[in-house]
């Protein structure tokens, strides 16, 4: 028996009314994972034993009727720490690493009686946009297994899109939730920087990283963000802004809502058919009563360059801790301490990670710091100012999530610049610390197109309101890939 076509609300009703137990639901989810895993490759680790034990304990205690997430299984990206469960960040460097603590977001899942059924595949240390940079395996697009899943949270996206799980967590540093959500036709949000604790997230770019949910629908996404949000004393960057009920405005109309469409988001470098799809989506929002007007974000064109200086610099610092001494991989080939460091890191890190460490080390070096890192920080401020000016007059900004639909496997893997440019539309949102969601907005040649809605800081409720209004009046989210029983 499978339950993967049922919403979280429907599953909650079944659990509360004892029509199904948490154990039965978890067993069915594990079957769904097993059945589809060879096709898509979403998981690095499936936590069958732990999940079944947890489900049995929840049944013993009883489902909480007031907690919609009680007994619900989900998957978690493999750079989010899970106590005594392999957490590899898809790297040889951490091939055997089992944390001795849970990330705050994981603690919050357990606190609401959610069941983690596995850890999902990703680009190594979240560096990449296709999930082809994993040390362990390749993840394939749920709609077409000859296409990339997107990245870096590719496994979390395909797990939801293929019907292995209903919900998952990913992380987003420059588009790593939104872009794979777009490529796989699911909902994915990068919350405002500081909305969700980063404690226990294996760090890549500390001023950019944020954990967020993937889901089949907008409401389910909001329901999961309700669980993981909030201030955390263990993360000094987590915000003290009060956490509202993110589902509160779902179902309300968007009459009079002002939405900005930046000309840069539908200009050069954007696939013509993707652009047409987004313009059609903008017209649809207008038909629902929103006011959509063209604006300019003039400095967004520098986003990719700024990001690859700042993110790589932060990564080169964060990844210094992986040296073969305390945990993780250690080389067998050494005669002295220098050899341990050099050979461990040379053998343990993949090509893309090494590339970014070198980029970051270069831009932080004494002769180049002012010319690169400092200047990137100044341009980042200009990008933030652009957003601030637009948000003085508008509620939301809309555009495509990615410039193209999912591309062929191995077609950009050897061309890092082409891969970097694929994050053209998502990166500025991270640089400015803003919330941004990707929702299904149409198809091009049988592949999903994502629409990105960007909000003011901590205005996730407004994003969900508009996203839900669009979703309720279209059927893109109802169309499923063949692997999930759909016709596409």
Curated annotation (Swiss-Prot):
One Pfam family in the UniProt entry: Amidase
Keywords from the named record: ATP-binding, Ligase, Nucleotide-binding, Protein biosynthesis
Active site: 77, 152, 176
InterPro entries per the UniProt record, alphabetical: Amidase, Amidase_CS, Amidase_dom, AS_sf, GatA
Reactions that this protein is recorded to catalyse: L-glutamyl-tRNA(Gln) + L-glutamine + ATP + H2O = L-glutaminyl-tRNA(Gln) + L-glutamate + ADP + phosphate + H(+)
Family, per entry: Belongs to the amidase family. GatA subfamily.
HAMAP family in UniProt: GatA
Protein name: Glutamyl-tRNA(Gln) amidotransferase subunit A
Organism: Streptococcus mutans serotype c (strain ATCC 700610 / UA159)
Organism lineage: Bacteria, Bacillati, Bacillota, Bacilli, Lactobacillales
């Amino acid at each position: 028996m499978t339950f993967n076509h049922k919403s979280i609300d429907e599953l909650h009703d079944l659990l509360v009314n004892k029509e199904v137990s948490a154990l039965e639901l978890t067993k069915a989810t594990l079957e769904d994972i097993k059945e589809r895993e060879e096709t898509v490759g979403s998981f690095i680790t499936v936590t069958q034993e732990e999940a079944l034990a947890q489900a049995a304990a929840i049944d013993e205690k009883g489902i909480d009727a007031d907690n919609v997430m009680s007994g619900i299984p989900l998957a978690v990206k493999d750079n989010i720490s899970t106590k005594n469960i392999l957490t590899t960040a898809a790297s040889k460097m951490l091939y055997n690493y089992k944390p001795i603590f849970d990330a705050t977001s994981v603690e919050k899942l357990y606190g609401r009686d959610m069941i983690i059924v596995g850890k999902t595949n990703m680009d190594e240390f979240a560096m990449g946009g296709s999930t082809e940079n994993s040390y362990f395996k390749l993840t394939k697009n749920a709609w077409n297994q000859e296409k990339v899943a997107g990245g870096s949270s590719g496994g979390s996206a395909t797990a939801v899109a293929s019907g292995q799980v209903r919900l998952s967590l990913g992380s987003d540093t420059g588009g790593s939730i939104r872009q794979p959500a777009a490529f796989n036709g699911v909902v994915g949000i990068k919350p405002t920087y500081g909305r969700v604790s980063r404690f226990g997230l294996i760090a890549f770019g500390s001023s950019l990283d944020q954990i967020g949910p993937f889901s089949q629908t907008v409401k389910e996404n909001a329901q999961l963000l309700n669980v993981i949000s909030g201030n955390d004393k263990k993360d000094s960057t987590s915000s003290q802004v009060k956490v509202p009920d993110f589902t509160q405005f779902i179902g309300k109309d968007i009459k009079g809502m002002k939405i900005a469409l930046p000309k840069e988001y539908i200009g050069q470098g954007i696939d013509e058919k993707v652009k047409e799809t987004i313009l059609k989506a903008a017209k649809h929002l207008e038909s629902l009563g929103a006011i959509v007007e063209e604006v300019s974000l003039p400095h967004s064109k520098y986003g990719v360059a700024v990001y690859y200086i700042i993110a790589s610099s932060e990564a080169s610092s964060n990844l210094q801790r992986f040296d073969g001494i305390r945990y993780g991989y250690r080389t067998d080939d050494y005669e002295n301490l220098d050899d341990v460091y050099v050979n461990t890191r040379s053998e343990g890190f993949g090509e893309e990670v090494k590339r970014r460490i070198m980029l970051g080390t270069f831009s932080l070096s004494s002769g180049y710091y002012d010319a690169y890192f400092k200047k990137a920080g100044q341009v980042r401020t200009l990008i933030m100012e652009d957003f601030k000016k637009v948000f003085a007059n508008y509620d939301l900004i809309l555009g495509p999530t990615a410039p193209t639909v999912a591309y062929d496997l191995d077609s950009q893997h050897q061309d890092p610049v082409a891969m970097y440019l694929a994050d053209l539309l998502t990166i500025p949102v991270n640089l400015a610390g803003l919330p941004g969601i990707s929702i299904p907005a149409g198809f091009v040649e049988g592949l999903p197109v994502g629409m990105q809605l960007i909000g003011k800081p901590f205005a996730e409720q407004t994003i969900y309101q508009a996203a839900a209004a669009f979703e309720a009046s279209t059927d893109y989210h109802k169309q499923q890939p063949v692997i999930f029983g759909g016709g596409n």
